[in-house]
Amino acid sequence: MLPVLRSGLRRAVWRCGHGLLQRRIAAGAGWYARACASDDAASRSPLKQEMLNSTEYLHVQNILLQKNQQRMTKQKLLSEATGFYDRFKINTKWLLIRGNRPFSGEEISTLLSWLILSQVLWVILGTTTFVSLLLFLANTVLAKEMVGKFVGNSLNRYMDGVDVQFQDAMVPEWRKGQISFQKVRLRTTPGAQDAGLLTFDLMFSKLSLTLSVRKWLQGRGLINDVYVSGMKGDVSVGAAERKDAKLIDFFSNPNYELGEVEVCDSVIMCTDQEIGQKFRVSIYNMRMSQLRFRWSLLDLFNADVVSGALNHSLFSIHKRQHKLPLHEMEKDMAPWKRISRLRLNPISVKDLGLDKSNAFNWIEGGSVEMIADLMLPNIYPESAAAEDENKYVVMDLRITFKDLIASMNTVPPALSNGRELISFDELKPIIMFVNNRRGLFSSLRNLDNNKLWRPTVTIERQQSYPDTTVIPMRTFQWPEGEGSVQLNQEIIKYHENPSDNSNEIILRCRIAKHMNELQNTFLFKETDVYDKMALELYTDLMKMIEETEYKKKNDWVKLLGTTFASQLLIFGLGAMV
């Protein structure tokens, strides 16, 4: 047993170092001493006593003592270093292995594993910084134009139907943590123009974005935040060959999601090929916290602010202002998450394409103004929610038509599916009501603007006064105390006399839609919201016409009754006299 222990101790001494191996030697020596002590306790033989007093045991103890005395601290190693490289080497080794010995194979493999893992984490968590560093190195080594062409060609290989061209350098912005592109052109290829529902040719003055590999691994796209400035171009939406075809089918990944989206100073010419109408859409400022392709309409209504112009008519989407938060009511809009207001200033009916639509093809001229309050629920369908949670979007619309011009069309109004909305017999009273109202208000305006009703009288005098004296025509005023009686107010009303000169027809309606019905839609015409709005507007318009006819009939009955009663009174008084 003793030769085995001796050989083991020798090998341990040769493998010993400054730290860990010294502890191994001390443990071996302690084990040797405990073994000897146990053997001595078992039996006090002369052989065991001789082993304790042997020179080999004393030699091992001497070596351990020398190693403990020669142990050097970090400060002593640094004091003996001669240069920066030596100090860096000592600090690095002391941080990693707490010593100054060479690295072992296991330690080197561990360092390489941690290095690779850290690079993977850097790419996942800091994708924009990683790509910015690559672009910076590429711009430093190669020409900037070559880098832009290479990136554009690489993107075109993986994007079907879309052509991307970088006409200027790609510069990383370190302060903002973005990658900026100058003069970027994005357009559809000729093959996609022939077969797709959507074709576009857009030019971006400045395009900044951030990337996220983590989002890309989740299947939600590589681009995270997008900032667009100076976008202009043409966008055309074609007619769908299939009834179930939607605009989202153009995109290869319908689950694509963007983070923060900002667009400013942009102009787009949109063409609706189905009705042959062009719209000039100007976007002054748009800020959205998120944009998901599957919920694009809801995210648009949830935008922080959207302001722009449609054919030079201003529109805006913003959070509606109300007085309830002034009273510090936490759940003042429950069960709604937010109430957004969509406002469109007066716009010509022809600019809006209303005369070319199937539902309002009898309108030839005039203007329309719209105010819509959209009540959005607190939760989205993909989140876990109880069954009693509100999942409906309520749209409260107020549409004002002004100076409408109506005429009978050869085709009756119809819905988007071709179903007849109203018949010609039901349409005739509407056209008569609109045209009679327009004729009445136009005559009143001509009467007010007629110079004969406000003449300027001039009198020539022979005295030393000025040659011409101007006497303005003054408006007649009732005596004091009778100011409540208006000039145009009649005691007995013989005809319809409106209270103002604005030929406005105000229609109101409310539409409720389940959130799932707005999923995977980019346009309102892809949903049946437009058809429901047309039905509600026609119902309100017919109700207005019936109320007007009833009021007119009631006024004539009052007039005839008053006239007949006055004649009887005069006849009775005459008979008495």
From Swiss-Prot:
Main location: mitochondrion
TM spans (from-to): 116-136, 557-577
Organism classification: Eukaryota, Fungi, Dikarya, Ascomycota, Saccharomycotina
Stretches assigned to the Mitochondrial intermembrane side: 137-556
Keywords: Membrane, Mitochondrion, Mitochondrion inner membrane, Transit peptide, Transmembrane, Transmembrane helix
Domain of life assignment: Eukaryota
Positions in the Mitochondrial matrix compartment: 12-115
GO biological process: intracellular monoatomic ion homeostasis; mitochondrion inheritance; mitochondrion organization
Cellular compartments annotated: Mitochondrion inner membrane
InterPro entries assigned to the protein according to its UniProt record, in alphabetical order: Mdm31/Mdm32
GO cellular component entries: mitochondrial inner membrane
Organism field: Eremothecium gossypii (strain ATCC 10895 / CBS 109.51 / FGSC 9923 / NRRL Y-1056)
Topological category with respect to the lipid bilayer: Multi-pass membrane protein
The keyword Mitochondrion appears for this protein: yes
One Pfam family recorded for the sequence: MDM31_MDM32
Record-given protein name: Mitochondrial distribution and morphology protein 32
Transit peptide range per the UniProt entry: 1-11
Record's function text: Involved in the organization of the mitochondrial membranes and the global structure of the mitochondria. Also required for mitochondrial distribution and mobility as well as for the maintenance of mitochondrial DNA nucleoids structures.
Record-stated family: Belongs to the MDM31/MDM32 family.
